């Protein structure tokens, strides 16, 4: 197989992620949608802090690139399934190009065009949203008992998120990346959920 067809892509709604989360199974499609939802908020927030001269259409183009890249970023999992991060690291310790990388490249040319060949800024923003969504999902549905495996993974991802934000601040200083911290705090706060009564009554 050298290209995914539409049936393969639609299977993303049935391929499960997160082997460590037992309370609610999350499909690749659910994760993809959630990352795109985060990007819909994150990109405008980042743009609002942009200090360099901005070309016409820059915000729309960046948002489009991020949304498209996010669509493809985990699509190879419809073929490979969920591979635990330690296993991925073990495989990739073998060299620059591994069988896993080769398989992902064969999945679909669009995967290469829209994600792996995306601009560094686009990839950085997608990774930011990806980490934020993972922290959110584990916070909502993971085992919150101290030192449980899920709890340790969540804290590890949270640390990776903060490290990524630090690196983004150094590599793309025209943006104020602290807005990502604020958005993540909002995502983790149940009180931020909209109450239907407040909509109906105009509160």
Curated annotation (Swiss-Prot):
It catalyses: dATP + H2O = 2'-deoxyadenosine + triphosphate + H(+); dADP + H2O = 2'-deoxyadenosine + diphosphate; dAMP + H2O = 2'-deoxyadenosine + phosphate. Keywords: Cobalt, Hydrolase, Metal-binding, Nucleotide-binding. DATP binds at residue 17. Uses a typical 2 metal-ion mechanism to dephosphorylate dATP. Co(2+) 1 binds at residues 31, 73-74, 130. Gene3D superfamilies: Hypothetical protein af1432 (1.10.3210.10). GO terms for molecular function: hydrolase activity; metal ion binding; nucleotide binding. Pfam families: YfbR-like. Co(2+) 2 binds at residues 77, 82. Disulfide bonds: none annotated. Its cofactor is Co(2+). Belongs to the Caudovirales dATP triphosphohydrolase family. Catalyzes the hydrolysis of dATP, dADP and dAMP into dA. This step is essential for Z-genome synthesis (containing aminoadenine instead of adenine). Specifically removes dATP and its precursor dADP from the nucleotide pool of the host, preventing the incorporation of A into the phage genome and favoring the integration of the Z-base into the viral genome. This is dATP triphosphohydrolase. It comes from Acinetobacter phage SH-Ab 15497.
